[in-house]
Amino acid sequence: QQNFEELNIVPMSISYEIEPCDIQKARELVISRKHKYVKAEGEDLNSIMSGIMKQKGNIHLNIGKPLTAEEIADAASCDKNDRYQKIRHAVDLRVIEGYKLWKNNYVAYDIANHSFKYSDKYDQADVEKFVSYMEHQLDTVEPEINREDLRRIFLDIYANPVVTKELLEKEKATGAILL
Protein backbone atom coordinates (compact mmCIF):
# COMPACT_ATOMS: atom_id res chain seq x y z
CA GLN A 1 0.00 0.00 0.00
CA GLN A 2 2.72 2.44 0.97
CA ASN A 3 4.55 1.86 -2.32
CA PHE A 4 1.51 2.84 -4.38
CA GLU A 5 0.84 5.89 -2.19
CA GLU A 6 4.43 7.02 -2.65
CA LEU A 7 3.98 6.89 -6.41
CA ASN A 8 1.20 9.51 -6.24
CA ILE A 9 -0.40 8.16 -9.42
CA VAL A 10 -2.05 10.94 -11.44
CA PRO A 11 -3.72 9.59 -14.61
CA MET A 12 -3.60 11.81 -17.70
CA SER A 13 -5.32 11.65 -21.05
CA ILE A 14 -4.49 13.34 -24.32
CA SER A 15 -7.23 13.42 -26.95
CA TYR A 16 -6.46 14.32 -30.55
CA GLU A 17 -9.12 15.44 -33.00
CA ILE A 18 -7.11 13.72 -35.73
CA GLU A 19 -5.13 10.56 -35.03
CA PRO A 20 -1.80 11.32 -36.73
CA CYS A 21 -1.01 7.66 -37.50
CA ASP A 22 -4.56 6.56 -38.36
CA ILE A 23 -3.89 5.13 -41.80
CA GLN A 24 -0.59 3.51 -40.77
CA LYS A 25 -2.34 1.74 -37.87
CA ALA A 26 -5.24 0.65 -40.08
CA ARG A 27 -2.89 -0.65 -42.79
CA GLU A 28 -0.79 -2.59 -40.29
CA LEU A 29 -3.88 -4.19 -38.72
CA VAL A 30 -5.33 -5.25 -42.07
CA ILE A 31 -2.05 -6.86 -43.09
CA SER A 32 -1.51 -8.53 -39.70
CA ARG A 33 -4.96 -10.14 -39.83
CA LYS A 34 -4.04 -11.96 -43.03
CA HIS A 35 -0.46 -12.94 -42.18
CA LYS A 36 2.40 -12.06 -39.87
CA TYR A 37 3.19 -8.38 -40.22
CA VAL A 38 6.90 -7.67 -40.45
CA LYS A 39 7.83 -4.04 -39.93
CA ALA A 40 10.27 -2.48 -42.34
CA GLU A 41 13.54 -1.15 -40.99
CA GLY A 42 12.95 2.25 -39.41
CA GLU A 43 9.15 1.87 -39.47
CA ASP A 44 8.76 2.35 -35.71
CA LEU A 45 10.88 5.50 -35.77
CA ASN A 46 8.90 6.75 -38.76
CA SER A 47 5.63 6.15 -36.85
CA ILE A 48 6.95 8.00 -33.81
CA MET A 49 8.03 10.94 -35.97
CA SER A 50 4.66 10.95 -37.75
CA GLY A 51 2.92 10.95 -34.40
CA ILE A 52 4.94 13.94 -33.31
CA MET A 53 5.03 15.95 -36.53
CA LYS A 54 1.72 15.28 -38.30
CA GLN A 55 -1.42 17.35 -37.92
CA LYS A 56 -3.58 16.42 -34.92
CA GLY A 57 -6.29 19.08 -35.12
CA ASN A 58 -7.46 20.19 -31.71
CA ILE A 59 -5.78 18.62 -28.70
CA HIS A 60 -7.23 18.15 -25.22
CA LEU A 61 -4.99 17.40 -22.24
CA ASN A 62 -6.65 16.26 -19.04
CA ILE A 63 -4.78 15.83 -15.79
CA GLY A 64 -6.99 13.60 -13.66
CA LYS A 65 -7.41 13.32 -9.95
CA PRO A 66 -4.75 11.26 -8.18
CA LEU A 67 -5.70 7.78 -7.02
CA THR A 68 -7.19 8.06 -3.57
CA ALA A 69 -5.88 6.44 -0.40
CA GLU A 70 -9.13 4.44 -0.35
CA GLU A 71 -8.53 3.03 -3.85
CA ILE A 72 -4.96 2.16 -2.97
CA ALA A 73 -6.00 0.52 0.32
CA ASP A 74 -8.69 -1.46 -1.54
CA ALA A 75 -6.08 -2.70 -4.04
CA ALA A 76 -3.54 -3.42 -1.30
CA SER A 77 -6.00 -5.78 0.38
CA CYS A 78 -5.97 -8.07 -2.69
CA ASP A 79 -3.46 -10.69 -3.73
CA LYS A 80 -0.63 -9.50 -5.97
CA ASN A 81 -2.28 -10.09 -9.37
CA ASP A 82 -5.62 -8.61 -8.33
CA ARG A 83 -3.85 -5.69 -6.68
CA TYR A 84 -2.28 -4.62 -9.96
CA GLN A 85 -5.54 -5.17 -11.82
CA LYS A 86 -7.41 -2.92 -9.36
CA ILE A 87 -4.82 -0.18 -9.74
CA ARG A 88 -4.89 -0.57 -13.54
CA HIS A 89 -8.67 -0.37 -13.52
CA ALA A 90 -8.71 2.78 -11.37
CA VAL A 91 -6.17 4.42 -13.70
CA ASP A 92 -8.12 3.31 -16.80
CA LEU A 93 -11.32 4.84 -15.44
CA ARG A 94 -9.61 8.18 -14.82
CA VAL A 95 -8.00 8.19 -18.26
CA ILE A 96 -11.31 7.40 -19.99
CA GLU A 97 -13.20 9.96 -17.90
CA GLY A 98 -10.72 12.60 -19.01
CA TYR A 99 -10.84 11.67 -22.67
CA LYS A 100 -12.54 14.31 -24.85
CA LEU A 101 -14.65 13.05 -27.70
CA TRP A 102 -14.47 15.06 -30.91
CA LYS A 103 -17.00 15.34 -33.75
CA ASN A 104 -14.85 12.88 -35.76
CA ASN A 105 -15.38 10.25 -33.06
CA TYR A 106 -19.17 10.58 -33.20
CA VAL A 107 -19.26 10.69 -37.00
CA ALA A 108 -17.10 7.55 -37.25
CA TYR A 109 -19.23 5.74 -34.66
CA ASP A 110 -22.44 6.48 -36.55
CA ILE A 111 -20.96 5.53 -39.93
CA ALA A 112 -19.44 2.31 -38.56
CA ASN A 113 -22.70 1.33 -36.87
CA HIS A 114 -25.07 2.55 -39.60
CA SER A 115 -26.80 4.72 -37.03
CA PHE A 116 -27.69 8.29 -36.18
CA LYS A 117 -27.26 7.76 -32.44
CA TYR A 118 -24.94 10.73 -32.04
CA SER A 119 -26.19 12.91 -34.91
CA ASP A 120 -26.89 15.72 -32.44
CA LYS A 121 -23.11 16.04 -31.93
CA TYR A 122 -22.25 17.00 -35.53
CA ASP A 123 -23.76 18.32 -38.75
CA GLN A 124 -23.66 17.24 -42.40
CA ALA A 125 -20.59 19.39 -43.08
CA ASP A 126 -18.74 17.48 -40.34
CA VAL A 127 -19.71 14.17 -41.96
CA GLU A 128 -18.57 15.32 -45.38
CA LYS A 129 -15.28 16.64 -43.99
CA PHE A 130 -14.55 13.38 -42.15
CA VAL A 131 -15.54 11.14 -45.08
CA SER A 132 -13.39 13.23 -47.44
CA TYR A 133 -10.45 12.98 -45.03
CA MET A 134 -10.96 9.23 -44.61
CA GLU A 135 -11.18 8.59 -48.36
CA HIS A 136 -8.04 10.66 -48.92
CA GLN A 137 -6.20 8.61 -46.28
CA LEU A 138 -7.47 5.32 -47.74
CA ASP A 139 -6.23 6.41 -51.18
CA THR A 140 -2.67 6.57 -49.83
CA VAL A 141 -2.52 2.81 -49.21
CA GLU A 142 -1.43 0.33 -51.85
CA PRO A 143 -4.46 -0.92 -53.86
CA GLU A 144 -3.90 -4.63 -53.15
CA ILE A 145 -4.90 -4.08 -49.51
CA ASN A 146 -8.63 -4.71 -49.05
CA ARG A 147 -10.21 -1.26 -48.95
CA GLU A 148 -13.31 -2.31 -47.02
CA ASP A 149 -11.22 -3.92 -44.28
CA LEU A 150 -9.08 -0.80 -44.21
CA ARG A 151 -12.16 1.45 -44.00
CA ARG A 152 -13.65 -0.59 -41.16
CA ILE A 153 -10.48 -0.42 -39.07
CA PHE A 154 -10.03 3.27 -39.88
CA LEU A 155 -13.57 3.96 -38.65
CA ASP A 156 -12.97 1.84 -35.54
CA ILE A 157 -9.88 3.88 -34.67
CA TYR A 158 -12.08 6.97 -34.43
CA ALA A 159 -15.21 5.24 -33.08
CA ASN A 160 -13.58 3.21 -30.28
CA PRO A 161 -13.28 6.15 -27.86
CA VAL A 162 -17.08 6.54 -28.06
CA VAL A 163 -17.55 2.82 -27.38
CA THR A 164 -15.16 3.01 -24.44
CA LYS A 165 -17.00 6.02 -22.97
CA GLU A 166 -20.28 4.11 -23.34
CA LEU A 167 -18.79 1.16 -21.44
CA LEU A 168 -17.62 3.53 -18.71
CA GLU A 169 -21.14 4.93 -18.33
CA LYS A 170 -22.61 1.40 -18.18
CA GLU A 171 -20.01 0.43 -15.60
CA LYS A 172 -20.88 3.44 -13.45
CA ALA A 173 -24.60 2.68 -13.74
CA THR A 174 -24.38 -1.04 -13.00
CA GLY A 175 -21.27 -1.41 -10.88
CA ALA A 176 -20.14 -4.26 -13.15
CA ILE A 177 -16.53 -4.13 -14.29
CA LEU A 178 -16.67 -3.81 -18.08
CA LEU A 179 -13.35 -2.16 -18.85
Give a label for each model feature.
Residues 1-179:
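Membrane-interfacial terminal anchoring regions of lipid-handling membrane enzymes
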